[in-house]
Amino acid sequence: MPIVNVKLLEGRSDEQLKNLVTEVTNAVEKTTGANKEAIQIVIEEMKASHYGVAGVRKSDQ
């Protein structure tokens, strides 16, 4: 049972997140041969203030 965790900055629409789940599921099915019914996608949205690169938070850019 593949479980895919996706972390991204908040701000996407519900439609975008729905499409993300569909497309990731299709990609996992195609590349691993797993049944769609067994594939789980977990989306975690982060605030820009909770994510940083090179010592700088995204909210400070």
UniProtKB/Swiss-Prot annotation:
EC number(s) on file: 5.3.2.-
Record: active site: 2
A GO MF label: isomerase activity
Alphabetized UniProt keyword annotations: Isomerase
SUPFAM superfamilies associated with the record: Tautomerase/MIF (SSF55331)
Family the UniProt entry places it in: Belongs to the 4-oxalocrotonate tautomerase family.
Entry protein name: Probable tautomerase SSP1389
Upper taxonomic lineage: Bacteria, Bacillati, Bacillota, Bacilli, Bacillales
